[in-house]
């Protein structure tokens, strides 16, 4: 079955963040600034890790992938979002499904990249003598490969459940991107199976990743509290603290968004709440990790010296 046959709608209209004309330019400038910071921050961190052999460690391998994912999923919808502020907000059916797939792929993958990073911190703090043996290149590769496989499977499930729906009455998406819940509201056929797929996939991915991270955190915290010296505890907390902040921002804002949009008539609130985890979190992650890390600052200093001198 072709995409055209699966739906009588050939294009969608994205409502965007606001329908007030006087807000379009300020919002365009605001999100352009956020997008520039996101691209520069994540691309800069990717480059810094790539060209500095001293940063070729398991922790920075995971951080490299986190920055890559943040950069990619921000690029999936932000350019279209910026264009919609200054022109007609139309996206084709194929374009909408493509955007949905890649958005779900990168968001789902990030959940398990954060799990891998939590496991990495657990091994580093709780079993430091076995760290390089446990976190071998093969293990790191398998953890990342598994993260992307989970992301791909989740994206296929979400997109496949949308492709089976028929959109015939309305083509106005009450959002600034093609997401599952706003699309479900437009279907003129039964959405029972698609809703079931959505809640199973989101529930499994969120619950498994959250439980894994919480267990890692509990073990890390119990180990840190057993460190006799205040200096040792402070160092352990500093390496662990940035990851806590990133995880709390990502899972907290994402969970709040989907809980908000699950209630009838609350899509408008969810639209604004989703800005935080789709736009703000990818912008903040490079700062959260690099500004608190001495290795990053040292590597940046060496890189700037090589470039300038």
From Swiss-Prot:
Signal peptide limits: none
Annotated localization: Cell membrane
Coiled coil: none
Membrane-spanning ranges: 26-46, 55-75, 99-119, 139-159, 197-216, 237-257, 271-291
One of the GO BP terms on file: sensory perception of smell
Family designation: Belongs to the G-protein coupled receptor 1 family.
PROSITE patterns xref list: G_PROTEIN_RECEP_F1_1, G_PROTEIN_RECEP_F1_2
Name used for this protein in its record: Olfactory receptor 8B4
Stretches of the chain found on the membrane's Cytoplasmic side: 47-54, 120-138, 217-236, 292-309
GO CC, one annotated term: plasma membrane
InterPro entries: GPCR_Rhodpsn, GPCR_Rhodpsn_7TM, Olfact_rcpt
Keywords: Cell membrane, Disulfide bond, G-protein coupled receptor, Glycoprotein, Membrane, Olfaction, Receptor, Sensory transduction, Transducer, Transmembrane, Transmembrane helix
Membrane topology, as annotated: Multi-pass membrane protein
Originating organism: Homo sapiens (Human)
Chain's gene name: OR8B4
UniProt function note: Odorant receptor.
Highest taxon of the lineage: Eukaryota
Keyword Cell membrane: yes
Gene3D superfamilies: Rhodopsin 7-helix transmembrane proteins
GO molecular function: G protein-coupled receptor activity; odorant binding; olfactory receptor activity
Keyword Transmembrane appears in the UniProt entry: yes
Extracellular side: 1-25, 76-98, 160-196, 258-270
Annotated glycan sites: 5
SS bond partners: 96-188
Main location: membrane
């Amino acid at each position: 079955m072709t995409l055209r046959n699966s739906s009588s709608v050939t294009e969608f209209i994205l409502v965007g963040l606001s329908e007030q004309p006087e807000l379009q330019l300020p919002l365009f400038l605001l999100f352009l600034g956020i997008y520039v910071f996101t691209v520069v921050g994540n691309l800069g961190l990717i480059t810094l890790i790539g060209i500095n052999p001293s940063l070729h460690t398991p922790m920075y391998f995971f951080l490299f992938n986190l920055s890559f994912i943040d950069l990619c999923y921000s690029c999936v919808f932000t350019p279209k979002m910026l264009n919609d502020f200054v022109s007609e907000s139309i996206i084709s059916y194929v374009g909408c499904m493509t955007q949905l797939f890649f958005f779900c792929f990168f968001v789902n993958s990030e959940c398990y990249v954060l799990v891998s990073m939590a496991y990495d911190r657990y091994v580093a703090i709780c079993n430091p003598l076995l760290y390089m043996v446990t976190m071998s290149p093969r293990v790191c590769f398998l953890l990342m490969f598994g993260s992307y496989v989970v992301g791909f499977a989740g994206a296929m499930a979400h997109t496949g459940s949308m492709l089976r729906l028929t959109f015939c009455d309305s083509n106005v998406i009450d959002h600034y991107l093609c997401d599952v819940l706003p699309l479900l509201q437009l279907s003129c056929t039964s959405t029972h199976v698609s809703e079931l797929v959505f809640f199973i996939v989101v529930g499994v991915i969120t619950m498994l990743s959250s439980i894994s991270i919480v267990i890692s955190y509990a073990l890390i915290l119990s180990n840190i509290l057993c460190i006799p010296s205040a200096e040792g505890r402070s160092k352990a907390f500093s390496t662990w603290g940035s990851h806590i902040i990133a995880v709390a921002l990502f899972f907290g804002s994402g969970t709040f968004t989907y809980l908000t949009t699950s209630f009838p008539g609350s899509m408008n609130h969810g639209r604004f709440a989703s800005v935080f985890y789709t736009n703000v979190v990818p912008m903040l992650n490079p700062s959260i990790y690099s500004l608190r890390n001495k290795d990053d600052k040292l590597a940046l200093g060496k890189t700037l010296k090589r470039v300038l001198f």
